[in-house]
Amino acid sequence: MKIRPLHDRVIVKRKEVESKSAGGIVLTGTAAGKSTRGEVLPVGNGRILDNGEIKPLDVKVGDIVIFNDGYGVKSEKIDHEEVLIMSESDILAIVEA
């Protein structure tokens, strides 16, 4: 994938949700709703602080994260693959194994 996020931006690939209906039918894709979990792909070099220093990001490539799918999250198609571009502040948690 040829994309390099800047500053505190993170590229995330949304994980597909699998859920079951009340009748036990497995729902996937749009029927299941949009997932707010994803895998972190490239990350920027960090957030620029008021004093000019760069604070490295807490998330790293390969992390599974839970994110806020709101106003600041941008959806883009890169190399025929849909990805999300967001600030690290849009990430709510890192899922640990």
Curated annotation (Swiss-Prot):
<comment type="similarity">
    <text>Belongs to the GroES chaperonin family.</text>
</comment>
<dbReference type="InterPro" id="IPR011032">
    <property type="entry name" value="GroES-like_sf"/>
</dbReference>
<dbReference type="GO" id="GO:0005737">
    <property type="term" value="C:cytoplasm"/>
</dbReference>
<dbReference type="GO" id="GO:0005524">
    <property type="term" value="F:ATP binding"/>
</dbReference>
<comment type="function">
    <text>Together with the chaperonin GroEL, plays an essential role in assisting protein folding. The GroEL-GroES system forms a nano-cage that allows encapsulation of the non-native substrate proteins and provides a physical environment optimized to promote and accelerate protein folding. GroES binds to the apical surface of the GroEL ring, thereby capping the opening of the GroEL channel.</text>
</comment>
<dbReference type="GO" id="GO:0051087">
    <property type="term" value="F:protein-folding chaperone binding"/>
</dbReference>
<dbReference type="GO" id="GO:0051085">
    <property type="term" value="P:chaperone cofactor-dependent protein refolding"/>
</dbReference>
<dbReference type="GO" id="GO:0044183">
    <property type="term" value="F:protein folding chaperone"/>
</dbReference>
<keyword id="KW-0963">Cytoplasm</keyword>
<dbReference type="InterPro" id="IPR037124">
    <property type="entry name" value="Chaperonin_GroES_sf"/>
</dbReference>
<protein>
    <recommendedName>
        <fullName>Co-chaperonin GroES</fullName>
    </recommendedName>
</protein>
<dbReference type="Pfam" id="PF00166">
    <property type="entry name" value="Cpn10"/>
</dbReference>
<dbReference type="GO" id="GO:0051082">
    <property type="term" value="F:unfolded protein binding"/>
</dbReference>
<comment type="subunit">
    <text>Heptamer of 7 subunits arranged in a ring. Interacts with the chaperonin GroEL.</text>
</comment>
<dbReference type="InterPro" id="IPR018369">
    <property type="entry name" value="Chaprnonin_Cpn10_CS"/>
</dbReference>
<dbReference type="InterPro" id="IPR020818">
    <property type="entry name" value="Chaperonin_GroES"/>
</dbReference>
<dbReference type="GO" id="GO:0046872">
    <property type="term" value="F:metal ion binding"/>
</dbReference>
<keyword id="KW-0143">Chaperone</keyword>
